[in-house]
Structures are given as C-alpha cells and as structure tokens.
Amino acid sequence: MTERLDVPVAGGTLAVFRLAEGGEPVLAVHGITANSHAWLAVARSLEGRAVLLAPDLRGRGASSRLPPPYGMEAYTSDMLAVLDHCGIERGVLVGHSLGAYAVARFAADHPERVRTAVLIDGGLARPLPEDVDPEQFLAAFLGPALARLELTFEAPEAYHEWWRAHPAMAGSDVSPDDLVAYANHDLVGKAGALRSGVAREAVRADAGELLELGKPAHRLSVPVEMLRAPRGLQNDPTPMIPAELANAWAGDAPHDRRVGEVPDTNHYTIVMGASGARVVAQAIVRALQSPVEDPRLRSPR
C-alpha cells in the first residue's frame, strides 16, 4: 500500500509516501536525482516489520514545485517537519546517497530526535588530491545524472526503456514494476516532451555543497550503521564510498558505528535491487531493535 501525506513546510507542502503497512515508522530519504519510489523494494522486504515514510525531497517527484532554498539546511528542516507532523519524537532514519548525507546532517544537528541512523552508500566524502580541480571533479561525478535531466521522451515507455538500458540497471535484480513506478514518478510534461521533474536548481545547489557534505558524519553521537556498495553509479568498479574510508570512520567510534558491504550491488541496486533491499531491510530492523538511549548522555566525537 502507498499512501500520500502532505506535510506543511516552508514554501508549501512536502509530499511524503507511506510505503507498506505495519510496524514502526522509519524516515527514508532518497538521493540527489531520485524520488521516494526508490524505496519500494526495501519497503516490500521489511514484510510488515516497519513502515517507510519516504518524502520526495523539495525539487523532486511530487515535491518538485516546492521553491528554494534547496540544500542540506532546507532538507533537514523538512525532515524535522515530517517527524513533527507524524508525531515521531525519536526516530530511526535511513538515507541513500544524498539522503545519507542529509540523515547524517540531521542526526548531527538534532541527536535528540534520532534513535539510530542507517547510511546507505553515502555520508562520507573522499578527500580530493591537491592536483584535482573541484569544479572539474563535480562535473565529472554528476555528469551522467545531470545529462538525464536534459533529455526529453516521446512517451513514458521510452523513459522506461532508457532506465532499463542504464548500466546500473541492465541485467540487475531490480523489479521491472518498481523501475516503471520509479520512472513514472519522476516524469513531468506532455506526450512528446516528457522529461524528469527534478529541479535543476536543486541539483546545482546540492552539487555546490558536495565537497563539504561528509563533515557531519564525523560528529555523530548516535548509533549508526553504514552499508556500502562495491560498485559505483554506472556499475563501474569505483565505489561511492571506498572501504578504507568507511572503516577509518567507523574506527573513530567503534562502539557506535558499524560498516558493512552489500555484495554484488552498485550505487542504485543497493536499495532498488532485490538482494540489496533485503540487506537494507535487515539493517533497518536492527536499528529498530536497538536500545533507546538518552543522547544527552553521549558526547559528540
């Protein structure tokens, strides 16, 4: 079951989707050009043990018309509004990609509202070598995602086919029905000129923060589990979060931080594929079963 909630936020209403039934609510935050329907496989894998509250971040999906500002401060304010609207005093938060950075920022700024966090293939930033230009790095890193926002399609089926052929999706265990639902939730416009509804301004604003986004994860004072994919955005062998980076971060607070690799996944299939979604669902269940501690008794690292 998918139910839409409209949550009042600055500038209008944020669309939040309640995915599945039964169990405790968990706030699930998607990636930079994604939408709430990226969580369909995870919601199904939870099998009634939790309900995902999946917002479309402002500038995406059914929240695409929400105005600026964009960026981490705006997203964390919207997340706080969702928790308040749903009566969640202290919740489990899970984020993928950009959503992992948003969850880390929220948990660092509002530890009293977070029971446990789950960060999926995001949350940390690799330091750039001195000889690498930051602007060129960002252009190369986000290039394929940004290029998609400029494409137009004659019909929804053409967009579905584009996604099926995507290197991260081709031959994967992503459900065809989930992929269609995810793509349809992104489409806007009229037949003959359909396109992604992601606001270009939002992506540009987020890109401007990318090199700083990894800092909040280092000051977390709540328990957190990080799951990483061994393959990248294009199913390439360069992961979003290298193992050595994740392990070093976890080593700074070994009692509070846990890191795991989800085998045979890439940046997309770690949440959208059947096998990745099962592992993510298990991490969410572990988070829900963790003891509730008073964050005021814990010290930031």
Regions found by a protein language model. Give the residues of each.
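N-terminal cap/lid segment of alpha/beta-hydrolase-fold proteins
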Residues: M1-T13
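Conserved HGGG/HGGXW glycine-rich cap/lid loop of the alpha/beta-hydrolase fold
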Residues: A15-R65
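Active-site loop/oxyanion-hole signature of alpha/beta-hydrolase fold enzymes
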Residues: F17, L53-V94, V271
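Conserved hydrolase catalytic core segment
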Residues: E89-V132
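A catalytic-pocket lid/entrance helix-loop region that shapes and gates access to the active site
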Residues: I120-E154
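Conserved alpha/beta-hydrolase catalytic His-Asp/Glu region
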Residues: E150-A207
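Conserved serine/cysteine hydrolase catalytic core
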Residues: L187-D252, E261
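Catalytic histidine-centered segment of alpha/beta-hydrolase-like enzymes
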Residues: V262-S275
